Amino acid sequence: MPKVDPETQKLYDEINGLIKKFQDDHKAKADCTMQEKCGDMSDIPKIRLSSKKILKGHINKVNSVHFAGDSRHCVTGSLDGKLIIWDTWTANKVQVIPLRSAWVMTVAFSPSGNFVACGGMDNQCTVYDVNNRDASGVAKMTRELLGYEGFLSSCRFLDDTHLITGSGDMKICHWDLEKGVKTMDFNGHAGDIAGLSLSPDMNTYITGSVDKTAKLWDVREETHKQMFFGHEMDVNSVCYHPSGNGFASASEDQTARLYDIRADQQIALYEPPQKNTGFTSCALSTSGRYLLCSGIEGNIHSFDTMKVCHNGMLQGHENRITCISLSPNGMCLASTSWDQQVRLWL
């Protein structure tokens, strides 16, 4: 490793000291634990989801999945260079969209179901109108959003005309899709953006990063409002609590965590029975009681958020699970994997 000069090392030490003081101050304000407050609550049933359908069509690793607002359709992106829009009720393909670059890492469905977006190692975000087709019969490309200096890791629609993206250049961008212009840059992370989750009211969002932190942002302001520490490795995924008052995170450090935004700190930590897997993605049930986390070993772990205990495991994938997405109505969980499969859990 290159030698660090004394002045730079002094700055590093000063920053780390401030971070530790910040964390210690937060811990001192935690007057109780989740287990103490929720210990007398009734246990919830073991998770009983099973893999009812396997969506087959991709011929390479599937990296991302996201549901439309109707809870029926989902879109998946794979290294085979295709987006596939699925009807999850019938397990049929609705559309297949060939991509210019096969290195797709993230996909998003607009809440209305009218548009899908994707991006990855091509350092751009591409938006398609699923209701309009070009001369070849493929969904019409409406926007190519350029200007990234790193891979695109996450994207989410605020509505049909606005999109938020996170990328490997440590930036979050707000786009006006009607004009095709970037309206705002959000800067604050010190590492690649890895995950992004919108609040239920669409006014704020959470990001997770390789810098081991999660941050809260207001869509109208360029600087973050809160920063959350705790993880010891990359924060791969974040998911807003249905109440809008907290969020869950999943990390390479083999833990998931629950944060309370109002208390400005972590309130629970979740670990698998055997610490043999980092977590790649997370989702909260519509009640907020179940936390689901996908692992690099190919299983989906379920946790009781209130009792802070492992609640079960969903098995079926044969390789690393890359992404999970819960339908807005909470009735179906979709998962994607390096085993080229998309599974629906009901």
Swiss-Prot record:
WD repeats lie at residues 57-96, 99-138, 147-185, 188-227, 230-269, 274-313, 316-346. PROSITE patterns: WD_REPEATS_1, WD_REPEATS_2, WD_REPEATS_REGION. It holds the Pfam family WD40_Gbeta. GO terms for biological process: signal transduction; visual perception. Disulfide bonds: none annotated. The keyword Repeat applies. The keyword Nucleus does not apply. Keywords: Repeat, Sensory transduction, Transducer, Vision, WD repeat. SMART domains: WD40 (SM00320). InterPro entries: G-protein_beta_WD-40_rep, Gprotein_B, Guanine_nucleotide-bd_bsu, WD40/YVTN_repeat-like_dom_sf, WD40_repeat_dom_sf, WD40_rpt. Belongs to the WD repeat G protein beta family. Guanine nucleotide-binding proteins (G proteins) are involved as modulators or transducers in various transmembrane signaling systems. The beta and gamma chains are required for the GTPase activity, for replacement of GDP by GTP, and for G protein-effector interaction. G proteins are composed of 3 units, alpha, beta and gamma. Interacts with Ggammae/Guanine nucleotide-binding protein subunit gamma-e. This is Guanine nucleotide-binding protein subunit beta-2. It comes from Calliphora vicina.
